[in-house]
Amino acid sequence: MKLSKDTIAILKNFASINSGILLSQGKFIMTRAVNGTTYAEANISDEIDFDVALYDLNSFLSILSLVSDDAEISMHTDGNIKIADTRSTVYWPAADKSTIVFPNKPIQFPVASVITEIKAEDLQQLLRVSRGLQIDTIAITNKDGKIVINGYNKVEDSGLTRPKYSLTLTDYDGSNNFNFVINMANMKIQPGNYKVMLWGAGDKVAAKFESSQVSYVIAMEADSTHDF
């Protein structure tokens, strides 16, 4: 099998969520954070030819980048991974899947309580401003008939009362109130346009960011509130 640049970019993103991954035959890949706060899945254009566990995905991708774009990836007779182009061959150790954390099955996200969207340029601004202003927490909330993302530094503002950044997403004509709080450490998502789905039921809250190719389900912080 061969991995395209698009697939490699997705795998690099997944490696930021979990350094290990279990690849299964087909065109669907998924991962989750070791602490369970983030789940990600993608439909890729390439076909995974064999099941294999990788303990250090980043290092595997680094080695892959050192051979030609035409390199063929296959399962060697000893159970390890063979990466070969016309002149060179690299053998990469496969992992025992018991040594990595991976999702057993795709997450079925519940029917959303609120659906909105965030454009690629707005997401890029949010991530850049967050780094520049040391924003470690964001809250997706409704205010004055709008759905808004507010950014905070929770270390200096534990009550999340003084936003350092605010971004209006869209109008909101619902009757429910919500304040979905996300740790920015869990916002490891690829650039792009996303449908944002918010769900709450009692003390359970989650958000799903869905693009045409990649989706992420992110757990909310305990101080999230809603009246759904």
Curated annotation (Swiss-Prot):
GO terms (BP aspect): DNA replication; viral DNA genome replication; viral transcription
Keywords: DNA replication, Viral DNA replication, Viral transcription
Record SUPFAM superfamilies: DNA clamp
A Pfam family the protein falls into: DNA_PPF
Keyword RNA-binding attributed: no
GO molecular function, one term: DNA polymerase processivity factor activity
Gene3D superfamilies (alphabetical): 3.70.10.10
Disulfide bond annotation, renumbered to this chain: none
Keyword Oxidoreductase: no
Domain of life: Viruses
Cross-referenced HAMAP family: Sliding_clamp_T4
Quaternary data: Homotrimer. Interacts with the viral DNA polymerase; this interaction constitutes the polymerase holoenzyme. Interacts with the sliding-clamp-loader; this interaction allows the sliding-clamp-loader to open the sliding clamp. Interacts with the viral DNA ligase. Part of the replicase complex that includes the DNA polymerase, the polymerase clamp, the clamp loader complex, the single-stranded DNA binding protein, the primase, the helicase and the helicase assembly factor. Interacts with the viral RNA polymerase (RNAP).
Family: Belongs to the Tevenvirinae sliding clamp family.
Main function: Sliding clamp that encircles the genomic DNA and links the DNA polymerase to the template to control the processivity of DNA synthesis. Responsible for tethering the catalytic subunit of DNA polymerase to DNA during high-speed replication. Interaction with the sliding-clamp-loader opens the sliding clamp so that it can be loaded around the DNA template. During transcription, encircles the DNA and tethers host RNA polymerase (RNAP) to it.
Protein name, per record: Sliding clamp
Gene: 45
